[in-house]
Curated annotation (Swiss-Prot):
Presence of keyword Lipid metabolism: yes
PROSITE patterns, alphabetized: COA_CT_CTER
Domain CoA carboxyltransferase C-terminal: 32-289
Keyword annotations of the record: ATP-binding, Cytoplasm, Fatty acid biosynthesis, Fatty acid metabolism, Lipid biosynthesis, Lipid metabolism, Nucleotide-binding, Transferase
Alphabetical list of PANTHER family matching this protein: ACETYL-COENZYME A CARBOXYLASE CARBOXYL TRANSFERASE SUBUNIT ALPHA, ACETYL-COENZYME A CARBOXYLASE CARBOXYL TRANSFERASE SUBUNIT ALPHA, CHLOROPLASTIC
Protein name, as recorded: Acetyl-coenzyme A carboxylase carboxyl transferase subunit alpha
Catalytic reaction(s) noted: N(6)-carboxybiotinyl-L-lysyl-[protein] + acetyl-CoA = N(6)-biotinyl-L-lysyl-[protein] + malonyl-CoA
UniProt-annotated location(s): Cytoplasm
EC number(s) given by UniProt: 2.1.3.15
Pfam family, one: ACCA
GO annotation terms (biological process): fatty acid biosynthetic process; malonyl-CoA biosynthetic process
Top-level taxon: Bacteria
Amino acid sequence: MLDFEKPLFEIRNKIDSLKESQEKNEVDLQDEIDMLEASLKRETTKVYTNLKPWDRVQIARLPERPTTLDYIPYIFDSFIELHGDRSFRDDPAMIGGIGYLDGKSVTVIGQQRGKDTKDNIYRNFGMAHPEGYRKALRLMKQAEKFNRPIFTFIDTKGAYPGKAAEERGQSESIAKNLMEMASLTVPVIAVVIGEGGSGGALGIGISNRVLMLENSTYSVISPEGAAALLWKDSNLAQIAAETMKITALDLLDLGIIDEVINEPLGGAQKDEEVQALSIKKMFLKHLNELKQLTPEELANDRFEKFRKIGSVVE
């Protein structure tokens, strides 16, 4: 339960208590239950339509929030995962493969968090090593060769900052991805489904279209990290989240992303199938638009999109 959900939790407890009492004591409490359920519905709508940036950060980090592998079966047909970077090893934090979207052969790449402690250790909490980014680039170049559109799912706190990752060229692998993705001649569409953290997100995020789920975040650093750097106090993370403009609506206003995908009330985890179908609908919409561009226009469109970010109006 998140802090802002406490009032809803209290109402649910009262409803459960009345239902238990009604069943146990064989008394009619249905009117009271109906009133509380109506109140819960109103309060739920009120809470989730007035979320603050820090509230959305907490939702984006929920362990039960759907991951890349949760969404893929709903969106793509006959998905086959491909492994390895052909240089060092396979990275379970970065998954990729080929499948079909509406009958069209496509390449799918995404960061993958774990579902529990054991899985998170295996997936390195969704923080990819250099070999993960090199695997992603290998699949992107393969997609370009066979003229397959590329879809990426961004869901990471950032690239793994460990000693071994740095020794194997973490910054180089991300930098190369940025360079190569900028010139790909096939459509590239990215969606931020949870946290989009720093260069770890950008390593698979240089795309013609950047979409975000309503309660996802996209930033150069976490609110805690920003607060610690700017004010020497990570406890000021809530203020940092407000200041940094990391939510989907803020980034849409700033022109950083192209579209916000609505979530079920309460977050994507409330109905992952409905959420997945919403993502699929947006994928098809933007893919149909990008199909009108030539290979050269696709590369130029992508380059210009990111070239304009951060421009200053005097």
